[in-house]
Amino acid sequence: MSNVKDPKAADEQLIQQAFDSLLNDYLHSNHRRKVERITKAFTFARHAHDGVKRLSGEPYIMHPLAVAQIVCSEMGLGSTSICSALLHDVVEDADYTVEDIKNMFGDKIAQIVDGLTKISGGIFGEQASAQAENFRKLLLTMNNDIRVILIKIADRLHNMRTLGAMLPAKQYKIAGETLYLYAPLAHRLGLFSIKTELEDLSFKYEHPEEYDFIHQQLKSTEKARNMLFEHFAAPVDPKLKALGLTYEMRARVKSAYSIWNKMQVKGVSFEDIYDIFAVRIIFESLPDVDDKNVCWDIYSAITDIYRIRPDRIRDWVSRSKANGYQALHLTVMGPDGQWVEIQIRSRRMDEIAEKGFAAHWKYKENHVEEDTELDKWLQTITEILENPDPNALDFLDTIKMNLFTTEIFVFTPKGDIKTLPQNATALDFAFALHTNIGNKCIGAKVNHRLVPLSHRLSSGDQIEILTSRSQQPQA
């Protein structure tokens, strides 16, 4: 009797295992138990892609299943998104229409699948105008349903995870496109884990030798990092327990791409980067106690033990980043004379940091009146997209500026925080306060020192604007 397994039977087993894994993750999520709906979408997609293989040799249906798994497990989305992910290639690759999807699964799923079909393929065309138009289509979908863009990012993530089956030239092009547009887009939507993986996978295919070098360096220094973490945590644990907290404290290592990027920007070696290692403290919220106050209690407990570096405090609990990120960051001198970055966040903050937009809306349901920085950014993007006939290059530059902009956080004399783009000047700050203040300003004090209005601001600066009633705006 032959021991060779029937290839078709092996494929069937592979497919069933992937679907069972998806259902298991879904049943352990917080969403309604719409298993029948998901099973129906899976059965439909499986039939539509029957007999089709990917370049890797596996059945094509494994790709929609993997995208659905990312959407469910890594983004925390529900059955509508899972079904849409399962069906996202049916209209493009099989003999079905959006109308067929609508008849089978309803308007909402059909609209999402239609949006995904319109933006299928790559963003980079041969010319800037084609590139701009493709990216415009991609971002326009945010107006109708943010889930289109989230599923598209999940689709790109799985394609990057399986990029090894493609020819090197194709790998290089897709990796470049991912690093140029998809990783910043994931970052702007708060998908930190996915953004990091997209960057690292792109780095792996664009700069394989540098990627391997950094991974070897990380591996060779792993034992020393583990010892540093144990020495650091030993005196901190009793302090946190004394606060009555349920928490976890773990070590976090900077991603390969982030390390390489910092080496390039600062012109330093691997050994010269001191923040490769960080400690993350995640606590469960206490009843009737504001999470912000708990963050500062933990801060006090740590600074009772270790010497702080004041210029490295980053307070994103008082005001979140534009992508919804909240945490309190500080840097202290560790037990072995090394600087250690610490990130303090609640479980809610951690979920928003890792799952981004999906978690943002989950927690926002009970606070509809809040108008967050993320909402403002989406509104800005919408306004840009509504420009009827943008110049292709101007459009791409504008969008990239909005995707890549790093915020700085500055203070008024009363201690109010204002968010400005990186490289903002004292004059930009004046206009951010009010148009009239911008028009009447004659100078500024930054950290109590007189500076010209062209002075570039940095995070943590305190700015006082000097005005004159007689000052008139310059034409």
Q: What is each of the regions a protein language model found here?
A:
Residues 25-28, 47, 51-54, 73, ...:
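General structural signal for alpha-helix termini and helix-helix connectors
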Residues 14-19, 98, 106-109, 115-279, ...:
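Internal insertion modules embedded within essential enzymes
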Residues 25-41, 97-109:
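Short, mixed-charge amphipathic alpha-helical segments
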